[in-house]
Structure formats: structure tokens, C-alpha cells
Amino acid sequence: MKAYLALISAAVIGLAACSQEPAAPAAEATPAAEAPASEAPAAEAAPADAAEAPAAGNCAATVESNDNMQFNTKDIQVSKACKEFTITLKHTGTQPKTSMGHNIVIGKTEDMDGIFKDGVGAADTDYVKPDDARVVAHTKLIGGGEESSLTLDPAKLADGEYKFACTFPGHGALMNGKVTLVD
């Protein structure tokens, strides 16, 4: 029995030592980061700046969707400084809109359930009830490889909390996010 306990103790110590291994690759990555200053920082700085730019002053955003019922973002930031704001939806998948169509519909958070319910029977109008006053803006329904845009007045977003979602039946639970008005 003592030998058995000794083996278990050795195994636990061995596993504990193995759990420390992930720290080693991080230490190995440090020398690689010390590449010549003329190449590495310039290449790294440009994408970081580009990712931060869309917040203020940019009056457009692009949202990508795919065949896995996903948007590539959960937050669209709309600048108050814009007179108009354009959102372009790009479907990066390959399936047609009849089986995996996507759109972007913007409405108040509390109105989205009603927008979904009324849109289910509106296949001919891209799953958006015609003339629905709760809908601030929407794109058309698109399939793989297609894109569609909507343009809205940011002032329409000043009162309340807003969401965007895909109203293709069954997609809204996964494909949604916030629309945030920013300075």
C-alpha cells in the first residue's frame, strides 16, 4: 500500500511539474519579439492603430456574417458627429440566402422580440415586416458572397438602447449585438 501511495505521490508531483510547462513557450517568444527595430514595431503598429480608428469620426462600419450564423462583432459604435452612418453587411459564407441568409435589422432593445415575431411571416420582404415603425434601419437579406448596406441618421439612436440582429428565422438568438452611440 505504501508503494502505491508513493507512486500516486510521484504522479501528482510529475503532473504538477508538467503544468508549469506553458510558461516556457512564453519565455521563448520573448527573443523573437526582439527582432530588428526597423521591421517588427512598424509592422505591428499599423494594424493596432487601424483597429482603434473606427471609434470617432468614422461614419461607416462593416459587419461580416458567415455560414455558422455568426457576426464578427457584438457592438457597432456610431459616432454622434456623423450626419449619416453607413453599415455594410458582408456575407463571407457560400450558402444561398434561402438556406443561410443574413440581414441586419436595428431597433430598440425592447422592440426586438416583436420585430422577430412579425418578421417570421415576411419572407417576401427579407423577414422584416413592411413599414414596421419599430425598425430604425435594415439591410436586405443576402446570401454567401453578397453584401448590402444601410444608412441611418445617428440622431435616431439618441433615445434608448438599440440592438442589431439577423431576422432570418432562428438566427437572432446567436446573431445580435448592441448599437452604441458614441461621442
Swiss-Prot record:
Residues in coiled coil: none
Membrane topology value: Lipid-anchor
GO molecular function per UniProt: copper ion binding; electron transfer activity
Lipid attachment points (N-palmitoyl cysteine): C18
Keywords, ordered alphabetically: Cell outer membrane, Copper, Electron transport, Lipoprotein, Membrane, Metal-binding, Palmitate, Signal, Transport
Entry GO terms, CC: cell outer membrane
Residues carrying lipid (S-diacylglycerol cysteine): C18
Classification via InterPro entries: Azurin, BlueCu_1, BlueCu_1_BS, Cu-binding_ET, Cupredoxin
Pfam families (alphabetical): Copper-bind (PF00127)
Region ranges (Disordered): 27-51
Binding residue positions for Cu cation: H102, C166, H171, M175
Domain annotation Plastocyanin-like: ranges: 57-183
Signal peptide: 1-17
SUPFAM superfamilies, per the entry: Cupredoxins
Domain of life: Bacteria
Subcellular location: Cell outer membrane
Cofactor or coenzyme needed: Cu cation
Cofactor note: Binds 1 copper ion per subunit.
Primary localization class, coarse: membrane
NCBIfam families for this protein: azurin
Protein name as it appears in the record: Outer membrane protein H.8
Species this chain originates from: Neisseria meningitidis serogroup A / serotype 4A (strain DSM 15465 / Z2491)
